[in-house]
């Protein structure tokens, strides 16, 4: 005798989604590769910014400190406000 609350075994309906072994199509692979490249560039920029923040003066050449000093002391500028 079967209990009224149990269900009789019925076959499951066929799945309407993509097959389990289906891979990505060409457009999805292209977008995935593009996003991956953007993430790599973002990580490289973040590493560079952190390195500059930790030691800002090591990346700056010493000549840039003295090139424009004489012109500024004389009151000459590269541009003039009219």
UniProtKB/Swiss-Prot annotation:
One Pfam family hit: Cortexin
Membrane-topology annotation of the record: Single-pass membrane protein
Keyword Transmembrane helix: yes
Subcellular location: Membrane
Keyword Transmembrane helix: yes
GO cellular component, one term: membrane
Tissue expression remark: Neuron specific.
Stretches that traverse the bilayer: 30-50
Keywords: Membrane, Transmembrane, Transmembrane helix
Region Disordered, annotated ranges: 1-20
InterPro entries per UniProt: Cortexin (IPR020066)
Protein role: May mediate extracellular or intracellular signaling of cortical neurons during forebrain development.
Family: Belongs to the cortexin family.
UniProt name for this protein: Cortexin-1
Organism: Rattus norvegicus
